[in-house]
Amino acid sequence: MQKYIVEARSLLALAIPVVIAQLSQTAMGVVDTIMAGSVSATDMAAVAVGTSIWLPAILFGHGLLLALTPTVAQLNGSGRRSQIAHQVRQGFWLALCVSVLIMLVLYNSDHVIKQMDNIDPVLAQKAVGFLHAIMWGVPGYLFFQVLRNQCEGLSKTKPGMVIGFVGLLVNIPINYIFIYGKFGAPALGGVGCGVATASVYWVMFLMMRWYVTRARSQQDIKLEKGFAAPDWQVMKRLSGLGLPVALALFFEVTLFAVVALLVSPLGIVAVAGHQIALNFSSLMFMLPMSLSVAATIRVGFRLGQGSVEQAQVAAYTSMAVGLLLASVTAVFTIVFREHIALLYNKTPEVVTMASHLMLLAALYQLSDAVQVIGSGVLRGYKDTRSIFFITFTAYWLLGLPSGYLLGLTDYILPAMGPAGFWIGFIIGLTAAAILMVLRIRWLQKQPTAFILQRAAH
């Protein structure tokens, strides 16, 4: 029992800074929306429309680079720290390649926005302007993630937390300058949010670069030691590990976007109630997601040490801690669901709808915790292809169709509206959680040599 308690402490020490970093990142989006909304409703809507395209694109790049964390953790655990710098340099090349791809997508985003039904031309113009501004921050954001993944792979999660919080503080005055046109800058409105966010990402990258070159714990990792040409073998291996994670993230984000579109014809009350429940669930999701990052680090590190048994301890402890936290947040959601809904909106019908959906959101949190932490454990084992197949099957082949049947048709029960989609979410996430656990159990039953060889690859 003692080894599980010790492991739980290590996991929480890694996870808490990740939670704070994620909150800072989310708060940046909230600040953008509020400050754009103070100019006009059109500017706020433009930022919202732009963000709906920006998020899937940038999360694809983010997911691709997550392959670095278990790679660095495994090299660190196995005492091969001298090889870390080369992996990270290739991470920069990979980030540069995917940056060009994402920037091309964002540059041509006007074609996507113009296809939206009855979109106001002024809103469309501002949304495109926002995307054309924020796209210059793509390399800065992904370069920052490369160095953040290096630090997290070395079990250093606090730098990401501190720099993320500083980024939030810097974002507010830069937003003010470019939104309202202060200190000689043009008044860009919602487009100014894109300029500010792009600028902040470069500031965050430079701060992280400054940290890794001066941190005593990383003095032996010489990133600046001469020019490193692309190593296509390493980049191919990192891409092979990262691409399934990137696609899984992309499919998850687009799933929620599709559900939002399917709910939209059901009326303002249904849409508002759904959005409140989803927004609050997203906040609660940060807890298991941070444990997922910690699980990747601990499992990767233990496998690097050659300790398959300790990797199992890390995997089971992360799951247990995640379920415990999810149980607490689920009870909190059930007890305070009406009070939470009132924070978002005071309309009685909307509060009633949101309160009803939050009962389902409470159940959703338990399955969500297991599946996202399971994903982190599998990343630690470098078994990322299974993550893609499990999430695609669970979300798109089970969750969405069952949600559609329950929410909008009378085939099974009378159409349930948004509640049907939330039951679909629960079905999909529960399936994902079960499949993740089964996959982890299968992996752990393999011969030790197979597990260690796979992790070292």
Swiss-Prot record:
Superkingdom, natural source: Bacteria
Membrane topology reported for the UniProt record: Multi-pass membrane protein
UniProt keyword annotations, A-Z: Antiport, Cell inner membrane, Cell membrane, Ion transport, Membrane, Sodium, Sodium transport, Transmembrane, Transmembrane helix, Transport
Entry-linked Pfam families: MatE (PF01554)
Principal location listed in the UniProt entry: membrane
Residue ranges crossing the lipid bilayer per the database entry: 11-31, 46-66, 93-113, 127-147, 160-180, 188-208, 243-263, 283-301, 316-336, 357-377, 387-407, 418-438
GO CC annotation, single: plasma membrane
HAMAP family: MdtK
Name of the featured protein: Multidrug resistance protein MdtK
The species this protein was found in: Yersinia pseudotuberculosis serotype O:1b (strain IP 31758)
Lineage of producing organism: Bacteria, Pseudomonadati, Pseudomonadota, Gammaproteobacteria, Enterobacterales
